[in-house]
Amino acid sequence: MAAGSSAVWAAQHPACSGGKFHHLSPSHSHCRPRRALQTPPALPARRSGASPPRASLAAAAPAVAVRTASEEAVYEVVLRQAALVEAATPQRRRTRQPRWAEEEEEERVLGWGLLGDAYDRCGEVCAEYAKTFYLGTQLMTPERRKAVWAIYVWCRRTDELVDGPNASYITPTALDRWEKRLEDLFEGRPYDMYDAALSDTVSKFPVDIQPFKDMVQGMRLDLWKSRYMTFDELYLYCYYVAGTVGLMTVPVMGIAPDSKASTESVYNAALALGIANQLTNILRDVGEDARRGRIYLPLDELAQAGLTEEDIFRGKVTGKWRRFMKGQIQRARLFFDEAEKGVTHLDSASRWPVLASLWLYRQILDAIEANDYNNFTKRAYVGKAKKLLSLPLAYARAAVAP
């Protein structure tokens, strides 16, 4: 894939830090069933003021067009998750157990300390591969922090199936088995300790299984698809491997109690951030992907710019390439702008890591421009000084109420 899937809304592209993931290989656990697969309520009526991030945003001129087929498909998942959260929130307030009762339940199901160990291991993985985000999770409540770690690990393991050291051995059948494991853990039958942590998470938060299934579908695409004819096609791929993460994690991170935004609009912003981050991955890694025989750019827009696949493989920066890249970067920034509107409506303890990630990732686009659009042989990155400056600024911005 262009740069690996997102592992959490605020820690996109887990593979960028390098390293192997052998310590997350599956192993058996002895966990008893915990819950039935959640069935979301009926979809709510669409609100006139909440529309999904536009796949139809033109690269050269940001005019809004009619909603595309990919947007329609993704929007149904957004509505489904938003409905699940809205239906669960009042019930959660009424039935929430005291912490000591939750701990007794954890011990009853997994045995003394096993679930705690599972979450701790997830935290160790997050700390190793997503240091900045891990730091931000320390501001969250313990329950939310552990849940985000569990989601991160599942996403990273999923990404490693097609981007890891054993990727050449992965088949569609293997991904089918992985999806069956996902269904099992949602039904309370985890296969190993990492699955157990996620199984516990989805029993406590109104998380829908569909975004997880959609991420697996993104992995399936990477087994056979290496070209995207239109941005509509690419948008759907970006949703599968990155936009899904926002839908997974917002139910855990929570929406600010004093927010006036609709649940649906906050999920649209989460989706936009995933799309923006994956587009940034793609634009950063054009040369790397080309060396693997892959092009994650809309071929019709390349043709409109007077460029061909051979121009990508040749890797020479020209006037045509600069003009093309300016349009692609402009579109990614539009998605970042859409995402930033929603971050301020997250729960106050969750805003900082998300906002910091957004600001840092958006600066990669600046770095591509600073490299004179040479993303063939130069890798754009954000220097340590800029990172250190962005973190306190993001913290200050996150402290402002929506």
UniProtKB/Swiss-Prot annotation:
InterPro entries: Isoprenoid_synthase_dom_sf, Squ/phyt_synthse, Squalene/phytoene_synthase_CS, Trans_IPPS_bact-type, Trans_IPPS_HH. The keyword Transit peptide applies. Disulfide bonds: none annotated. It is an enzyme of class 2 (transferase). It catalyses: 2 (2E,6E,10E)-geranylgeranyl diphosphate = 15-cis-phytoene + 2 diphosphate. Its EC number is 2.5.1.32. Residues 20-54 are annotated as: Disordered. One of its GO terms (biological process) is carotenoid biosynthetic process. The keyword Chloroplast applies. Transmembrane segments: none annotated. It is found in: Plastid, Chloroplast, Plastoglobule. Residues 44-54 have a biased composition (Low complexity). One of its GO terms (cellular component) is plastoglobule. GO terms for molecular function: 15-cis-phytoene synthase activity; geranylgeranyl diphosphate synthase activity; squalene synthase [NAD(P)H] activity. Keywords: Carotenoid biosynthesis, Chloroplast, Isoprene biosynthesis, Plastid, Transferase, Transit peptide. Belongs to the phytoene/squalene synthase family. This is Phytoene synthase 2, chloroplastic. It comes from Zea mays (Maize). The gene is PSY2.
